[in-house]
């Protein structure tokens, strides 16, 4: 009985913390003069709490595992909603595909550039050093 209560408590705590970050993000999004989805702000809040080790990862791990396990199922209503507007999407399919492709390439370039900027050039262990004959 005690083990069952402990497991229930762990799942309850995980979902309460995840939803608290979500609703805090929604609240903050309502206060901002620009439009940023509250769920994105909530994820950033959760990330900051975990990165600064204010919240231990094991507190949210059970809830995250459940959400990840059933993530594909959670996208079904979104896909059905998109299919309701298939006529509009079909009329604009070319621009949508082009914008997705261009934005993907931009993300690749920005991530590559920022990674090189942050990490710089490092010596590879076991690789011989190049001699500069100038």
UniProtKB/Swiss-Prot annotation:
Protein's UniProt keywords contain Cell inner membrane: yes
Subcellular location(s) per record: Cell inner membrane
Membrane topology note: Multi-pass membrane protein
Keyword list, A-Z: Cell inner membrane, Cell membrane, Membrane, Transmembrane, Transmembrane helix
Residue ranges of the TM segments: 5-25, 26-46, 66-86, 93-113
Any GO CC annotation of this UniProt entry: plasma membrane
HAMAP family assigned to the protein according to its UniProt record, in alphabetical order: UPF0299
Family assignment from sequence similarity: Belongs to the UPF0299 family.
Name assigned to this protein: UPF0299 membrane protein KPK_1586
């Amino acid at each position: 009985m005690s083990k069952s209560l402990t497991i229930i408590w762990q799942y309850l705590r995980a979902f309460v913390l995840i939803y608290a970050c979500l609703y805090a993000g929604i609240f903050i999004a309502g206060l901002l003069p620009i439009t940023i989805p509250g769920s994105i702000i909530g994820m950033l809040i959760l990330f900051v709490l975990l990165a600064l080790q204010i919240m231990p990862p094991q507190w949210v791990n059970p809830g995250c595992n459940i959400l990840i396990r059933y993530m594909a199922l959670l996208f079904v209503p979104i896909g059905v909603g998109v299919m309701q507007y298939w006529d509009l999407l079909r009329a604009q399919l070319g621009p949508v595909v082009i914008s997705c492709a261009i934005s993907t390439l931009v993300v690749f370039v920005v991530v590559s550039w920022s990674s090189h900027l942050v990490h710089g050039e490092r010596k590879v262990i076991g690789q011989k050093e190049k001699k500069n004959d100038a």
